[in-house]
């Protein structure tokens, strides 16, 4: 049996600042006063517990979990990886949730008024549990880029949002996964707001081993919840 991981203070220099001037909305909603440290309490040492019985059989397959009258449009991809704690141990049986735009760069919600088509067979949301090795796996459609009005001719790179609790409330993480070689990364203030030394932790790796022949390209994205090598959080 693994020994419990001791939670150490977060490595804040690896994460984006709360206020990043180039990311306009962060200036409006970011805190303007110093943070007040809180003592660790019992509730911070535990997290909600989910099991396989809480999931549907197609929750992990975004290409099938919202089908109405056909297949979703776009490039099929497999996204998989391991969830690790700050000690490098796998985080087993933890819930991983994702959401994303469709292949045209459109989200399924009323606030998204981007002039791009919705896909009636694609919801853009899924979830799964990690296995005994801390591994998760999703089958989905590669999301498209979309304009977002932050600055002139601003476009978000292709990305997938991730949400995890891990074993503790103190390891809560919401982040974004990007794709290798995306030219928009150099112009995106959300990605660029992450300290340079930690940006590569947000970029998935193409994997021929994960690729399903004739069906879907594969990408690996490992997630570290805390510690010196933590995956940077989304602000």
UniProtKB/Swiss-Prot annotation:
Listed cofactors: Fe(3+)
Gene Ontology molecular function terms on file: ferric iron binding; protocatechuate 3,4-dioxygenase activity
Keywords assigned: Aromatic hydrocarbons catabolism, Dioxygenase, Iron, Metal-binding, Oxidoreductase
Keyword Oxidoreductase included in the entry's annotation: yes
SUPFAM superfamilies xref list: Aromatic compound dioxygenase
Reactions listed under catalytic activity: 3,4-dihydroxybenzoate + O2 = 3-carboxy-cis,cis-muconate + 2 H(+)
Source taxon at top rank: Bacteria
Enzyme class label: oxidoreductase
EC numbers for this chain: 1.13.11.3
Pfam families documented for this protein: Dioxygenase_C (PF00775), PCDO_beta_N (PF12391)
Binding residue positions for Fe cation: 107, 146, 159, 161
The keyword Metal-binding appears for this protein: yes
InterPro entries in UniProt: Intradiol_dOase_C, Intradiol_dOase_core, Intradiol_RC_Dioxygenase, PCDO_beta_N, Protocat_dOase_b
Function: Plays an essential role in the utilization of numerous aromatic and hydroaromatic compounds via the beta-ketoadipate pathway.
Protein name as it appears in the record: Protocatechuate 3,4-dioxygenase beta chain
Source organism per UniProt: Burkholderia cepacia (Pseudomonas cepacia)
């Amino acid at each position: 049996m693994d020994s419990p991981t001791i939670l150490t203070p977060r490595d804040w220099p690896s994460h984006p600042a709360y206020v990043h001037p180039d990311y306009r909305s962060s200036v409006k909603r970011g805190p303007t006063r110093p943070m007040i440290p809180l003592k660790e309490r019992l509730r911070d040492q535990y997290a909600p517990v989910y099991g396989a019985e809480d999931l549907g059989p197609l929750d992990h397959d975004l290409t099938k979990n919202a089908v109405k009258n056909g297949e979703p449009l776009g490039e099929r991809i497999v996204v998989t990886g391991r969830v690790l704690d700050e000690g490098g141990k796998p985080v087993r049986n933890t819930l991983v949730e994702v959401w994303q735009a469709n292949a045209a760069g459109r989200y399924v919600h009323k606030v998204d008024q981007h002039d791009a088509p919705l896909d009636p067979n694609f919801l853009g949301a899924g979830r799964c549990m990690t296995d005994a090795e801390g591994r998760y796996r999703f089958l989905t459609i590669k999301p498209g880029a979309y304009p977002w009005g932050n600055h002139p001719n601003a476009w978000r790179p292709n990305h997938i949002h991730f949400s995890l609790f891990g074993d503790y409330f103190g390891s809560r993480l919401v982040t974004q996964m990007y794709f290798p070689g995306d030219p928009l990364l150099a112009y995106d203030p959300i990605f660029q707001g992450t300290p340079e030394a930690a940006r590569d932790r947000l970029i998935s790796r193409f994997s021929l081993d994960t690729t399903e022949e004739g069906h879907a390209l594969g990408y690996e994205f490992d997630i570290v919840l805390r510690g010196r090598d933590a995956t940077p959080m989304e602000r």
